[in-house]
Amino acid sequence: MLFFDTETTGLSGGTGTRAFMVGASDFVPGGLRVRQLLITHLSAEPAMLREFSRWLAEDTRLVSYNGRCYDAPLLAARYLLARQGTPLAGIEHLDLLFPTRRRYRGVWENCRLATIERNALGIVREDDLPGSEAPGAWLQYLRGGDAGLLRRVLQHNFQDVVTLAHLLLHLAAPDDARTGGA
């Protein structure tokens, strides 16, 4: 299983939207491995896409949070525009948003990942940069700005892909083994 998340230049998902960061985690002997790819100039996108492709094998199962509707289609479009075949076609993809909604809709105010982290997993992010601020942080960096905000985007993405692994284990646990009030 490869848990993955992207940070992008916007939420529209059109051809002008780029993934400037791809994060992924997977279970390896000894624990959870996290890998991140970040482009620091626009011409690096094809190389980032090629490297992400190397992380995928025929038996890979993707796991995401809203990735079936957003991250995977966005990456597929970027592979097409880079004239690279998409490695995502035909790969099994589990989007944790849907089982999470089935379980927690109406229990909490929403099913945003931060809400699920706090209420179901007991994770409270300290000094987290909201994902909505990631595009601005990246663009500021490209324009010669401080890398401090970009480091916060990396940390945000890191936490997202770690949380996905915890959430899958939480959702798979028997009801009496779960914590978090639901």
Task: Show where each model-derived region lies.
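Surface-exposed cleft-lining segments at the edges of enzyme active sites
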Residues: 8, 35-39, 149
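Short conserved beta-strand segments at catalytic cores or DNA/RNA-binding microdomains
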Residues: 18-30
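Conserved DEDDh/DEDDy metal-dependent 3′-5′ exonuclease domain
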Residues: 32-120
